[in-house]
Amino acid sequence: MQINLEKYIRTVEDFPKKGISFKDISPLLADGKALNYTIVEMASLAKDVDIIVGPDARGFLFGTPTAAFLSKPFIMIRKAGKLPGEVEEFAYELEYGSAILEVQVDMIKPGQKVAIIDDVLATGGTVKAITKMIERAGAIVDKIIFLIELEQLQGRKKLENYDVISLIKIS
């Protein structure tokens, strides 16, 4: 059964600040059938990978249940200072400043096929940084899966060397 996931995405104008047209995934998360459909779709795309990686925080919402559905490991990518123990850091530039992402040491192994799962592809900057982290660990980015792609922001261009799949495309 096909479900039109776009009807579960609410647009909130001027949030979190004026001029932003925020895509709210809360209605999708609040509907068990739509959420299940989303996870099953993502799992069908990620079935051949070794591990699933997701960024803090909304990548966790889709990456973790997808990994559990496939009985695969889920690895968290977090902002600096949020993971215990020894971590690998990756600094990257944003449009207005810089940021640091972290992953716990030895969570991503050389040769592993990785799927990155996140909620929204906007400018692509954060996910591009995650691809570099994965490749620095010697692993292979096999797929990048998003719930929503905001096509007008052209984030796909930053990820043109990867297999990028979006369940919903909004122009």
UniProtKB/Swiss-Prot annotation:
Record carries keyword Transferase: yes
InterPro entries documented for this protein: Ade_phspho_trans, PRibTrfase_dom, PRTase-like, UPRTase/APRTase
A GO molecular-function annotation: AMP binding
UniProt cross-references to SUPFAM superfamilies, sorted A to Z: PRTase-like
Pathway(s): Purine metabolism; AMP biosynthesis via salvage pathway; AMP from adenine: step 1/1
Primary enzyme class: transferase
Catalytic activity: AMP + diphosphate = 5-phospho-alpha-D-ribose 1-diphosphate + adenine
Keywords on record: Cytoplasm, Glycosyltransferase, Purine salvage, Transferase
Xref: NCBIfam families: apt, PRK02304.1-3, PRK02304.1-5
Function: Catalyzes a salvage reaction resulting in the formation of AMP, that is energically less costly than de novo synthesis.
UniProt name for this protein: Adenine phosphoribosyltransferase
Upper classification of the organism: Bacteria, Bacillati, Mycoplasmatota, Mycoplasmoidales, Metamycoplasmataceae
Gene: apt
